[in-house]
């Protein structure tokens, strides 16, 4: 009897797989798509500090900004740190880092703002006894935070393009 129900499960799985294979899904960043063309026409404002540089590099991987740029993307990252996991002696054993990025995309030709907004992300890192380990963990946490913010900005840009 178990053999029969197992065959039904396999059959249903096969039918679902065939149905999905027949649909017309296409990659979002496919060369020549509207989204890819839009993203290739965005130039990034120059980074001003270490955090902006990490954010800039992550976005530069996705945005071409080479030929015929029509838009300028300006980003202002902000961050704050809070203690979490307080030890009995009052030392923080963990820090939570919250980041915000205000972004604005304008048309280069006329300076008209196309869209602006803000994104938020957070991450954390452990405090240890070693100052070197704390510095390394802190830098890694800030890098992860900027990458999260860049990914959220990219998502927002794709949604801008998708709107009629």
Per-range role (PLM):
Residues 1-12:
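Bacterial N-terminal signal peptides that target proteins for export
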Residues 18-22:
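C-terminal motif of bacterial Sec signal peptides marking the signal peptidase cleavage site
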Residues 24-27:
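Bacterial signal peptide processing site
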Residues 56, 64-67:
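Extracytoplasmic
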Residues 60, 64, 150, 154-162:
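Sec-exported extracytoplasmic/periplasmic mature domains
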């Amino acid at each position: 009897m178990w053999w029969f129900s197992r065959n039904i499960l396999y059959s249903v799985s096969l039918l679902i797989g065939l149905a999905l294979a027949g649909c017309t899904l296409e990659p979002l960043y496919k060369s020549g798509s509207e989204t890819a063309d839009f993203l290739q026409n965005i130039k990034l404002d120059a980074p001003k500090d270490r955090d902006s540089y990490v954010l800039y590099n992550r976005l530069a991987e996705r945005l071409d900004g080479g030929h015929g740029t029509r838009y300028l993307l300006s980003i202002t990252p902000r961050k704050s740190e809070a203690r979490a996991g307080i030890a009995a002696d009052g030392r923080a054993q963990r820090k939570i880092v919250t980041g915000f990025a205000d972004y604005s995309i304008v048309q280069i030709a006329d300076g008209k703002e196309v869209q602006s907004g803000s994104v938020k992300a957070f991450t954390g890192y452990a405090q240890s006894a070693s100052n070197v380990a704390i510095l390394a963990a802190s830098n890694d946490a800030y890098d992860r935070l900027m990458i999260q913010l860049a990914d959220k900005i990219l998502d927002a840009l794709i949604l801008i393009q998708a709107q009629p």
